[in-house]
Amino acid sequence: MKTNTIKNLFFWIFLLFSGSLSAIPSEAEFRKLAETWTLHQDGSQEYRYYKELTLFTHTAMNSTYGQTFITYNPDFQELKIHSAYVKQKDGTTIQTPDNAFVEVLPAGAADAPAYNRLKEMVIVHTGLELGATIYLDYSVISKAGYLPAIDVCKPLEESSPIKEYSLTFNLPA
């Protein structure tokens, strides 16, 4: 009898906490997230990333999503920023200024001289406020032969909900 009471108690505690955790609002929401891998006829590859991210909390603005980090190898890859801007809650569009694109050494390559050629583009999103939406569209284009095949081993690691997610592969005929 005592074990059944303890089991019931744990069950109700679990139910209580699981219900309260789902009621916690997220700090941001991806309205759209799209990833596209394209294999070109010449063997080069293009990875294209597009996101629309609406911010709801100060934590989302200041630490979680205030910057975007893109790692690439400039010897074999080219980074193209197609668009980067913020649309504020009132509809005002703030284009990302040139000085908000900062190229740094990736943190993981700091004590590894063999990887000091890698670059990390830090895009600092400007004009953020509660209710603002970040729009970012970029491509990393790899030269032919750098990547032997399209190898997507990438978990979806977003801590905020995603309304629309698109994963596309374009292959030559």
Q: Residue ranges of each PLM-predicted region?
A:
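Bacterial N-terminal signal peptides that target proteins for export
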Residues: 1-10
